[in-house]
Regions:
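Helix-coil modules at protein/domain termini and other flexible surface or pore-lining loops
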Residues: 1-265
């Protein structure tokens, strides 16, 4: 069966530091308008909470009663180069968390079964074994046990092969909890962000696990205007800022940043 997700062109309508189909102001407006159409208390308010030292905007999106019950936490943080970007980030964090935990808590989204019964439709055992770095040489024994474990399976899309497959949701949730939920102005935006979140976690975990020396990035070579402005705000506050290239061999840019205040050391 082909994927239910069908990717389409999503033309950029906003390109100030971010590539989005609409501006952050439109994102926030659309989000709040959508909330008016559902009989749920999801968003209580958005609040700017940065203390002004860096002058880099940070927002909270504070959960309403129903969102708090579903998510279990009171607020989400959003950040951006401008106040509107930061507020949009905060409300989209709320959107993705509310959607994710709503999905997780709905039994209708899952099929409780064993790998033995679903393997013709499911992610391969070999791929599942790689998720826990099993190099024991005893995969045959592990397979015998795994095949009989009752797991919660849910439908996913193999974009490479354009087909639906079953994913052992609780297996991956036990390992990584919610790794890569993402929201966007359209499916393509959300998917791009989710894939990039997985890449950054993947590369940073490899670098940390294997203690890989990676190239430093000379911040004086940065040419993007807003990025230079943000770097300048750290310098003006007396905070040391370092960046490293975490891309490894993925072909997808990933950057690690470290900031520290010398007055606290």
């Amino acid at each position: 069966m082909g994927c239910k997700i069908k990717l389409k062109n999503a033309f950029k309508g906003y390109t100030f530091d971010q590539d989005k189909i609409v501006s952050p102001e439109e994102t926030v407006g659309h989000f709040k308008n959508r909330l008016k159409t559902v009989n749920l208390d999801i968003l209580e308010e958005t609040v700017r909470i940065d203390n002004g030292r860096l002058d880099i905007p940070v927002y909270f999106s504070v959960c309403g009663r129903d969102a708090l019950e579903i998510i279990g936490t009171k607020k989400q943080m959003g950040k951006g180069g401008t106040p509107s970007q930061s507020e949009a980030s905060a409300v989209m964090e709320l959107a993705e968390r509310f959607s994710f935990f709503s999905f997780w808590k709905n039994p209708a989204n899952f099929r409780l079964d064993t790998y033995k019964n679903v393997k013709g439709e499911a992610l391969s055992f070999e791929a599942i074994a790689k998720s826990v770095h099993d190099e024991s040489g005893e995969l045959d024994k592990a397979r015998e046990i795994f095949e009989n474990l009752p797991l919660k399976w849910t439908s996913g899309c193999n974009l490479t092969k354009d087909r639906e497959i079953l994913i052992p949701f609780d297996w991956f949730f036990a390992i990584n909890e919610f790794n890569g939920p993402s929201a966007g102005n359209c499916v393509e935006e959300a998917m791009s962000q989710g894939i990039c979140e997985l890449v950054e976690r993947h590369t940073s975990s490899i670098i940390s696990r294997e203690k890989i020396n990676v190239p430093a990035i000379d911040l004086d070579t940065v040419t993007d205007a807003l990025t230079r402005e943000l770097i300048g705000k750290y310098k003006n506050a007396g905070i040391q800022l370092f960046a490293s290239d975490f891309s490894l061999n993925t072909g997808i840019p990933s950057v690690g940043a470290l900031a520290y205040d010398p007055t606290t050391f």
